[in-house]
Amino acid sequence: MAVNGNNTFLDHTSAMEVLKEYERRDGLDIRDLMDSKLQGGLTYNDFLLLPGYIGFPASAVTLDSPITKRITLKTPLVSSPMDTVTEHEMAIHMALQGGVGVIHHNCSPDEQADMVRKVKRYENGFILDPVVITRDTTVGEAKALKEKWGFGGFPVTESGNLGSKLVGIVTNRDIQFETDLDKPVSEVMVTDLITATAGVNLLEANKILAESKKGKLPIIDKEGNLVSMISRSDLTKNLHFPLASKTKDSKQLICAAAIGTRPEDKDRLAKLVDAGLDIVILDSSQGNSMYQIEMIKWIKKEFPDLDVIGGNVVTREQAAALIAAGVDGLRIGMGSGSACITQEVMAVGRPQATAVYNVSSFAARFGVPCIADGGIQNVGHIVKGLALGASTVMMGGLLAGTTESPGTSFVSREGKLVKAYRGMGSIDAMQDKKAGGGGKDAQKSNAGTARYFSEGDSILVAQGVSGAVAHRGSINKFVPYLAAGLKHSLQDCGMTSLQELHECVENGTVRFEIRTASAQLEGGVNMESYEKKLYA
């Protein structure tokens, strides 16, 4: 006991023991926070996580988290299947950064399948389906193949097929400055080849490739027939992108794509699976329908090795129906996206934080991972979505401004560089005719009308808007910034992994606090003028 004038203080060394005298810990546990009878429906801005004890560096935090029952990502970030967000470029770079991109379906089945192939061919361990040409293939045709697939270095076999005798390789250097486009590649190809024999493991093959200083290493059988390849560029990518999301067997990038629940989507899915698809997302604003349940059961029967993510859902009742049908993951959110007006127009939906907690806590009992889809405007929202039980978060508007998104870049009236972005429920998206080949029946094939059950409507009711978002630079800088911010947030909470975060939220170790309107104002910037740089 210490005395200071008229004040008597406790011994400072007893602080931890005195703390135990308090009946309640600071803040709220997750159940008190999410009690809708007391709090109502909550959004991400309505609460904060309270800090814990930091006993480790942020670099020690791991972000591994499942997106489906069978597939785990090293970065829990997913790009949305919107036609101004995710095509093959976005899907490739999201996968390279440890996340995954979901390719939209507001295009023809063949176009979507081509995008899947580009993702799967981008980075390989053993390339089991290389692009093979014959001696008679022209230089012009080889250049066209390079333009189409985005890579060069084509093996030449007698028949032009895998399994045929290898006779040479055409590299970029062989055709780069060749002006005679009709010349057969037999006149320019490399015939002095370094190869490896079938049965070699990936580590040994990579060593041979590194020592050979060649760009490609063909793998042949005892008869000299081509069976597979490995690429030097993939070795480089492995060094630059150690977190890349890859399949365990082929070492190809993981690729996801969305489809609808119409009968013709079964044919679309068959083409996507043939192209190498790993995950299919059933794209609907309201997933608890007879159409989606029937589609889930059909997919699990026809393609048992394909992971299926159902949704969207915001209640336990919706989730239960899809879990019972056999989904491998769920997508949570209705009306919370930045370009979505479903809650306003339809008066149906749910505040995102409340939806994520209620659905994910129920789905966790069945081992079904959940994606928090919508309402993500910053790193803090990502943290909150994961703290409420989601395994990953899906982003649309936050990624639409990146270089890799397919949206059009332009200068706004204010002189700022922006990119076009639209909700799939917007009139612009629902009237897009690419999916139907531009025909008069294109509305029936449109991804937007399918998502919002409007294929046969004579009057389209918008559930989204069109606009623009600020240009954010490359995914290769923006996603690492999001991941670094997430690690520092978990460090502040005293959590070393997302699994630990989920466990400590459930057992009450991680605490929360409701934010009043004044508290939200206090937590923002309060300056006359300022410049907000997100990362450097």
Curated annotation (Swiss-Prot):
Enzyme class: oxidoreductase
Family assignment from sequence similarity: Belongs to the IMPDH/GMPR family.
EC number: 1.1.1.205
Keyword check for Cytoplasm: yes
Active site per UniProt: C340 (thioimidate intermediate), R451 (proton acceptor)
Organism: Neurospora crassa (strain ATCC 24698 / 74-OR23-1A / CBS 708.71 / DSM 1257 / FGSC 987)
A cellular component annotation (GO) from this entry: cytoplasm
Localization (cell): Cytoplasm
Pfam (any one): CBS
Domain CBS, residue spans: 126-187, 189-245
Record-listed IMP binding positions: S338, D373, G374, G375, G396, G397, Y421, R422, G423, M424, G425, Q463
Assembly mode: Homotetramer.
Role played: Catalyzes the conversion of inosine 5'-phosphate (IMP) to xanthosine 5'-phosphate (XMP), the first committed and rate-limiting step in the de novo synthesis of guanine nucleotides, and therefore plays an important role in the regulation of cell growth.
Keyword Transport annotated: no
Name of the molecule in the record: Inosine-5'-monophosphate dehydrogenase
GO biological process: GMP biosynthetic process; GTP biosynthetic process
Pathway of action: Purine metabolism; XMP biosynthesis via de novo pathway; XMP from IMP: step 1/1
GO molecular function: IMP dehydrogenase activity; metal ion binding; nucleotide binding
PROSITE patterns hit by this protein: CBS (PS51371), IMP_DH_GMP_RED (PS00487)
PANTHER family named among the record's database cross-references: INOSINE-5'-MONOPHOSPHATE DEHYDROGENASE, INOSINE-5-MONOPHOSPHATE DEHYDROGENASE RELATED
Cofactor: K(+)
Catalytic activities: IMP + NAD(+) + H2O = XMP + NADH + H(+)
Regulation: Mycophenolic acid (MPA) is a non-competitive inhibitor that prevents formation of the closed enzyme conformation by binding to the same site as the amobile flap. In contrast, mizoribine monophosphate (MZP) is a competitive inhibitor that induces the closed conformation. MPA is a potent inhibitor of mammalian IMPDHs but a poor inhibitor of the bacterial enzymes. MZP is a more potent inhibitor of bacterial IMPDH.
Binding of NAD(+), residues: D283, S284, S285, G333, M334, G335
